[in-house]
């Protein structure tokens, strides 16, 4: 038990340090955009600045996942609860989702949003993170068809669903889905291979809100990931 706690603490501190360092590098790269002599490189595909920017993005994302996971296992993750307008939150989520889909020309992003959703008490940043993690996961495993964000009002909850027409998940792999550092991919060189932390973080965020999370999936048909936030 003590070794596990020590490892979790190390993971949290390591990811925090890496995240800070990468953020400083990102700030320096952003500063280059304001240097007049470098204007010819801005927005040019494969230019040094754009290459660095593109390389930094997934690294920062992975390190952020590590830090968030470290917060879950060391009980550091807390919520800053406030009144949340789901429609306003969704506007920002869908803007980012559109950017995630820029390289997926065969995939259409759809919305199915209930009318007259009430204001809820939640952590808007964590709620946004949970929804974006599900969308990012759908984008990663969907090459054609649709990704649908569905939100509906239930008697005691708001139900969030991200549905895709991706590769789906075999039944024997269902138990791995919310486990950290697990993958459903057999090919260890698959570019979609990550650390398996995104869905675990979603589960923890939802748990902190006293909600529930689950999924349904069929190979070759697609997947639907759900979570609820109490009213």
Q: Residue spans of the language-model regions?
A:
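Short helix-loop "hinge" at the ATP-lid/N-box region of the Bergerat-fold HATPase_c
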Residues: 138-139
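Conserved glycine-rich
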Residues: 210-211
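Glycine-rich G1-box
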Residues: 99, 167-168
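Short alpha-helical segment of the dimerization/phosphotransfer core of two-component systems
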Residues: 54-59
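Short conserved segment of the HATPase_c
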Residues: 169-181
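Conserved catalytic submotifs in the C-terminal HATPase_c
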Residues: 73, 80-84, 104-118
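A conserved beta-strand-to-alpha-helix junction within the catalytic ATP-binding
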Residues: 80-95
């Amino acid at each position: 038990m003590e070794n596990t706690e020590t490892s979790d603490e190390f993971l949290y501190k390591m990811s925090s340090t890496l995240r800070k360092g990468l953020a400083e590098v990102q700030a320096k790269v952003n500063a280059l955009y304001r240097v007049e002599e470098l204007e010819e490189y801005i927005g040019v595909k494969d230019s040094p600045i754009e290459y660095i920017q593109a390389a930094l993005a997934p690294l920062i994302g992975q390190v952020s996942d590590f830090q968030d996971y470290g917060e879950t296992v060391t009980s550091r993750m807390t919520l800053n609860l406030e009144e949340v307008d789901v429609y306003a939150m969704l506007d920002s989520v869908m803007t980012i989702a559109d950017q995630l889909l820029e390289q997926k020309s065969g995939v259409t992003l759809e919305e199915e949003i209930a009318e007259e959703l009430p204001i809820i008490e939640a952590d808007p940043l964590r709620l946004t993170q949970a929804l974006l993690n599900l969308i990012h996961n759908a984008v990663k495993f969907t090459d054609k068809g649709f990704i649908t964000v569905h939100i509906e009002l239930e008697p005691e909850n708001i139900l969030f669903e991200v549905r895709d027409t991706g590769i789906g998940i075999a039944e024997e792999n269902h138990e791995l889905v919310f486990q950290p550092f697990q993958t459903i991919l057999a090919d260890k060189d698959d570019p979609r291979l990550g650390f398996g932390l995104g869905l675990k973080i979603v589960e923890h965020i939802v748990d902190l809100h006293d909600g529930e999370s689950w999924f349904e999936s069929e190979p070759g048909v697609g997947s639907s990931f759900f979570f609820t936030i109490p009213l």
